[in-house]
Structures are given as structure tokens and as C-alpha cells.
């Protein structure tokens, strides 16, 4: 959040997508998956405050609830679409088409379905980064990061405590935490169950996860 306030929100989202691309490249070139996932997660964590924070800079307070609803709805839709797309990318049909692509004089060294899928994700993040460059400057004054980042911890604790003590804040935080916590765990449970009980492939199980999510 402090990083999102220190720079224009569009630039923060651009840099965040760059971090995600770096994480994908790390996995593509053999870095331990846990480390690569951590880098991608860092980019996603930095992206979210800017994504929501820019609404307060672009819109009047009377439209924030409506705008937040659109953001939440599109986020959920993108997650479902991402699960379906990921399942298709590692499936035999799509991966065979991707691996059969031949670029003259270019050796991509991409020889497996996961590598092809990660390459497509890199292009998706590049497209998202291009859209980030089209976000206009809002003219809102920036708040510089403190010299000692540790000082952000007491501020975070204070803000978090105030939210949980507020009745409407409690409802919002509890509902959001429950929703994302349950949906995140359910996704992996359905994937594992579909493979063990139904004998589904990753592609088929991903499609089932999309249906369950809807």
C-alpha cells in the first residue's frame, strides 16, 4: 500500500506486471518453482492496492461502491477464466499446437507443455503492462516511502485494528476473508478430488473448478 501511494498508480501496476513477468521467466529458466511463485505473488500483492486505490483518485465518493463492485466482479471472472485457460494451455490439444509453432532462425528452447503455457502467460502479462501505460496521471500528490520501512508495521497494525473495531469494517473484512479463504482452498480440493475420484486430467479438472466457482 505504501508503495502504491509513493508512485502514480498506473506506474505501480506496470512495475507489478514486470515483477510477474520476471517470476515467469525465472520458472521458465529453471529457478525453483517456490521462488518463482514467490516473485509472482509479490507482483500480485503490489498490484492490488494500486488497482483499488486508483478508484478513489478517478471517481467521486458516490461512485466508489459501484466501481468497487465492478472491480470485484471482474477479478472473480478473471480468476475463473484464468483457471480455465491454464487447464487448456497444459492440455494435449492446445500444448501440441503451441509446441508445433516454428519460428525461423529462432530457437526458443521451449519443448514441454508447461514451458509453452508459461510463455503464453508472459505475453498475457505484457499485454496487461501495455494497458497500464495507458492509465492517465490523476494529479494526486504522492506520499514518499519512509526511510525505515519497519515503521510501516505499527501503522499497519493501527489501521487493521481500527477496521476490525468498526462494525461495518468487521462485516466487510470477515466476509471477504471467508470468501477468498474458502474459494482458494476449494479450488485445490476440487482439483485433487477430480483427479482421484473421477480420473480427470488437469484440463478436465480445471474446467470442473470453473463450473464449481460459477
Question: What are these model-derived regions, one by one?
Answer:
Residues 26-37:
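Helix-loop junctions at membrane interfaces in 12-TM secondary transporters
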Residues 25-26, 88, 159:
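Alpha-helical transmembrane segments of multipass membrane proteins
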Residues 90-118, 161-214:
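A single, central transmembrane helix in multi-pass transporters
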Residues 18-25, 119-129, 214:
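Hydrophobic alpha-helical transmembrane segments of multipass integral membrane proteins
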Residues 1-21, 35-91, 133, 171-188, ...:
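Substrate-agnostic recognition of the 12-TM MFS/MFS-like secondary transporter fold
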Residues 6, 30, 58-61, 111, ...:
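Helix-loop interface residues and adjacent transmembrane-helix termini in multi-pass membrane transporters
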Residues 53, 57, 62, 110-148:
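Helix-loop junctions on the cytosolic side of multi-pass membrane transporters
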Residues 135-175, 197:
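Juxtamembrane intracellular "pre-TM" segments in multi-pass secondary transporters
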